[in-house]
Amino acid sequence: MTRIQNSHFRQEGTIMPVIFSEKKRHEISRQIKEAALRLFKTKGIRKTTVAELAESVGIAKGTFYNFYATKGQLVAEIMDDFDAASERELRNKIGGRDKIPIAEFYKYYVELFRPDTAFSFHFTPDDITVMQEMEETRKFFSQESTVYKGLHRVGI
């Protein structure tokens, strides 16, 4: 993993943020998400600090907030990514059909949550409770979730 240099420099006694290119912003954001998943898996969301996330990718704690307003916003973006990937995967599997047999959907759903590939496997049991409490992630436990919509669509 490439370490990112400190994103602040001193100019006339002040600390000024460095402006990142879109490409660099995307790369740093990806690194933050990867670090978050690693740390969440071992420590949980509640015990993972913004300082640890920033340090793990080589940025200042304050620079983290140039990417995410809160840790909850980071978790929500990770969940959005998973939700979008799940929807793409489901669309690929159903091949343009409007409906699929329940057995086929169930097979897909079981594959999606296999422990070796599952998004949920990156979180501790306490994390589900934490995510239900976070305003930024609450929607994933409601009817807005792609997985929830898919289950509802097939009558589950």
Which residues does each predicted region cover?
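Hydrophobic alpha-helical connector segments
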Residues: 77, 91-118
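A short, mixed-charge helix-start or loop-turn motif at secondary-structure junctions
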Residues: 17-19, 68, 133-134
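Alpha-helical DNA-contacting segments of helix-turn-helix folds
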Residues: 75-82, 89
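Short secondary-structure transition hinges
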Residues: 111-156
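N-terminal intrinsically disordered/low-complexity leader segments
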Residues: 1-27
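Helix-turn-helix
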Residues: 31, 39-73, 77
